[in-house]
Each structure stands twice: as C-alpha cells, then as structure tokens.
Regions:
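Short helix-capping segments at alpha-helix termini
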Residues: 91-95, 189-193, 233, 300, ...
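Conserved C-terminal helix/tail region of periplasmic/extracytoplasmic solute-binding proteins
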Residues: 337-382
Length: 382
C-alpha cells in the first residue's frame, strides 16, 4: 500500500528549523531501521538457488549483490507488499539467484523516495503521483511497474447521501489532507469545494456513521475503512475516483536508477518473482490465507489476519476490475501519467514547468516488457 504523503508536504511547506530537524530525524530513524529488523531472502522455503534461471543469468543476478525491498507500510497485505513477502517465503527470489532483504516502511512515501534515491533501498512501493512529485523536487528515482490506473483513496458517506453535490456546505473529514484524486472526483461531480468544512479526523472510521461533530463524509482507503465499518455492521457508500475517470495507481513500484542501470536483469527478475507470487497469492482462498500467514509471521501476534485478508482481496479485485489499458499486469499506462500531471497542475501540487513529457521519462516499461510474453509473466526466467 502506498500512503500519499507528498501532496500534503507540497501544499503545506514550512521553513521552521524545528520541523526540518524533526523531519531529518524521522528519515534517519527509518534509515537506521534499514540496517536491522528485516528478513533475508527465502527464509521459509527449501527451493534450491538458481532452479528457475540459466547459469549465465544467475551469475548476473548474483553480481547485483544485496537488494533491499522497502514496503509502503509495514507488512500490511496490500498489493506491492504481500507478493514480495510471498516471493521471499516461497523461494522465488532464491530460484532467480536474487539476494533480497525485506524492510518494513513507515507509511511515509516522502521518506521512501529519499531512501530509494540515496541507495539505502533498492526497490520500493511508490505511487505514480508520488513519484512525479518526488522527481519534480529533484529526487532521482524511476517508476518500473503499476497494477492499475485505479487508486486506493476513496470518499465514504452515509446512505442518506445519494449524490456527491449533497455534500455542499457539509463537514468532510480527512487524515491530514483530502487526496487530490478525491478532490478531483468531488469537483467533477459538481461539489462546491469552497462550501465544505474540512476537518482532520483520527483513524477511527466509526466517526462517520456516528456523524460525530456533524460529519457527513470521510476519506479513506478502499481496502481498509470500508471493510472495518462493514465488519462493525455499519453500511456506508464508497465513492471511488476511478468511477469518475480520475487518475491514480495501485501497486506501483520504483527503483534506484543507478542500480537499475548497473543490474537490469536483477530488476527484471525482482518484478518477475513478485508477479509470479501475485498470481500464487490470488489463485485461491487457501493460497491467499497462506500468503497472509507469511505476513503475519513477520509482523507478530497483533497482526489482524482477517482484516489483512480483506485488504488483499479488495485490492486485487479493484486491480482485476480496472486493468491497465493495453498493458500486461505491471505495465505502466503513459496516458495515466499525463492525466496525473494535469491533476497535479490543477491543484498546484507540482510546478507548471513540469510537463507530461518530462514525467513520462521518469517511468519505464522496459523491465515489465522483458519478462512478459503474450500478456503473461514468463516463468521460469531464461
């Protein structure tokens, strides 16, 4: 899962030294965490190294050395996280002679992009929108895959709201900011943005059905809060930006460009292993349970396996319902990048000097193209 924090940072910059110092400290803490609290490649498998790859390509991947995967948010069972955990546990990385270490991210995309650019992480989950913002701010990373132009950000309302313009003049809750895709959806639907009262809420979605402090709508993630509310017996309407042709992304991945240039086969095969694991984890309820169990083992006793199973099944359904046009699973849609730039310009999140042509060069399908044949991931590797 990719938590889009960079938009908030862009819209609410500050030069106060105390905040800058705290931000630097937070980045340092995550960087320190990258030296420990991780799991090495193929921890739970008996597969033999190189069993799914030629000797020549195996040597190339071994020469790449240690590869650090940094998740978007802890070991949550989201697309872009669970399949990497499963690829490790099922031995797929080992099968391809890859030395992959998994690291849990904090949920702060801005930190992930900096760690990726500095080489402290090799590959990481970074939403397409966040990658554009990072590159616009001089952070050098490259987008290498995405599962869908749909996104995770949604707006929830109680059942008495049947059309979004009914929210005019009402209270809308958020977790620090209203995601650009949600605002774009609301404005496209005819909501008078300046009429809204925007309030920061915590992470308890029950404030919506309780209409706490007059709350009529609440932002969230399609795979999280709606499932929590449903489990509690609360029925809400979920408004998804993709239904209004608003751009976003799910499961997007980025790489350190210097590593990718030096070790292209390793980048290809990291994606190959992850996509092979994605297919495994999505194949049946039993295999989904198996994969979520791997994440639970890494996370500890407090891991909510039931909720995380719902997270995976919800996100993979959104991906299946909204395949990337003219692309295999993992392929990036250049037109979606153009639409994202337009949206970021609309809300002054990136400078007008950042063009769609600029942004398209920050993404590549070369690695996905290299591992795909007739729309399917090639396994084993050549």
């Amino acid at each position: 899962m990719q938590h889009s924090t960079m938009q908030h940072r862009t819209m609410h910059r500050t030069t106060h030294r105390t905040k800058a110092a705290l931000a630097a400290l937070a980045t340092a803490v995550v960087a320190l965490a990258l030296t420990g609290c991780s799991t090495g490649s193929s921890a739970g498998t008996t597969s033999s190294e190189g069993s799914a790859i030629s000797a020549e390509r195996c040597k190339e991947n071994q020469d790449a050395g240690k590869i650090t995967y940094l998740s978007g948010y802890q070991y949550q069972s989201s697309a872009s996280i669970l399949e990497y955990i499963a690829a490790d546990e099922l031995g797929y990385f080992k099968d391809l002679c890859l030395d992959v270490t998994l690291k849990p991210g904090s949920g702060d995309t801005a930190q992930n992009t900096k760690l990726l650019a500095s080489g402290q992480a090799t590959v990481s989950a970074v939403a397409e929108q966040d990658l554009i913002q990072a590159r616009a701010n001089g952070i050098d990373i490259t987008g290498i895959s995405s599962y869908s132009n749909a996104g995770l950000d949604v707006l929830m309302t109680n059942k008495d709201i049947t059309k979004l313009p009914q929210l005019d003049g009402q209270v809308v809750g958020h977790k620090g900011y209203v995601p650009a895709s949600v605002r774009a959806m609301m404005e496209k639907a005819g909501v008078e943005w300046d009429s809204l009262t925007l309030v920061k809420e915590g992470y308890d979605p029950s404030v919506l059905p309780r209409k706490q402090n007059g709350l009529e709508a609440l932002t969230g993630f399609v795979s999280n809060e709606p499932n929590l509310l449903k489990a509690a017996g609360d029925d809400v309407t979920v408004w998804q930006p993709v239904d209004y042709d608003i751009p976003s992304s799910i499961g997007a991945m980025a790489v350190n460009p210097a590593f990718a240039k030096a070790h292209p086969t390793a980048v290809e095969d990291v994606l190959r292993a992850a996509l092979h694991a994605y297919d495994f984890c999505s194949a049946s309820e039993a295999k989904t349970k198996q994969c979520v169990g791997y994440a639970a083992k890494l996370s500890g006793a407090t891991y909510d396996t039931a909720q995380n199973t719902k997270i995976w099944t919800t996100e993979t359904k959104v991906i299946a319902d909204n395949p990337t046009p003219d692309q295999p699973l993992g392929g990036i849609d250049p037109e979606n990048v153009t639409k994202l730039v337009d949206m970021l310009h609309q809300f002054d999140i990136v400078k007008s000097s950042v063009t769609a042509d600029d942004a398209k060069r920050w993404f590549t399908n070369e690695y996905i193209d290299a591992i795909t044949k007739d729309g399917e991931t090639v396994w084993p590797a050549p």
